[in-house]
Amino acid sequence: MSAEDPNAGEDADAEEEEDIRYFVRIGQTDLDGTKSVERALTELNGIGHRAARIIAQKADVDRRAVFGKLDDDVIERVVERVENFADDVPEWMTNHQKDYFTGETTHETGNDLQLTRRQDINRMKMIDSYRGVRHKRGQKVRGQRTKSTGRTEGTIGVNVEAIKEEQAEDAAAEDDE
């Protein structure tokens, strides 16, 4: 900042803010460009904190860098790592191991993940597997206890206030007699 132009520092900050891409599109999802690479990638369905950190590391990107300020070629590297995530990590870290029809292990993201999960559940329902039957009935699927938790119906309890009001009315009626 100089004496001649008191706003010189503010113009540089304004230009720096204008260089940012506020939305970065990966697949069918718009990611927030004002967040760090790691935080922005977690907005994508199927990518958690650990996966986002691995993607940033494999793409040679600082995970704390602002996503919208990255160059196009760096963003392309990140997109490529997201698409090929299953190749970079062990099989146990992917979200869709051993596909029923193809036997492949993939890592689904975005709408593909939701579609794949829905198809798997519908297939289990159709073949009447144990998990499919539990899904059909709307019960817990993964072995949780159901005796006391997960009840969906309304409670059939005692309304203490109503009883006290009735008792007060009865007592008042007896006093009047």
From Swiss-Prot:
Keyword Aminoacyl-tRNA synthetase recorded: no
SUPFAM superfamilies: S13-like H2TH domain (SSF46946)
Molecular function terms from GO: rRNA binding; structural constituent of ribosome
BP terms from Gene Ontology: translation
Annotated protein name in UniProt: Small ribosomal subunit protein uS13
PANTHER family: 30S RIBOSOMAL PROTEIN S13/40S RIBOSOMAL PROTEIN S18 (PTHR10871), SMALL RIBOSOMAL SUBUNIT PROTEIN US13 (PTHR10871:SF3)
Gene name of the encoded protein: rps13
Gene3D superfamilies given in the database record: 1.10.8.50, 30s ribosomal protein s13, domain 2
Family to which this protein belongs: Belongs to the universal ribosomal protein uS13 family.
Region Disordered: start-end pairs: 132-177
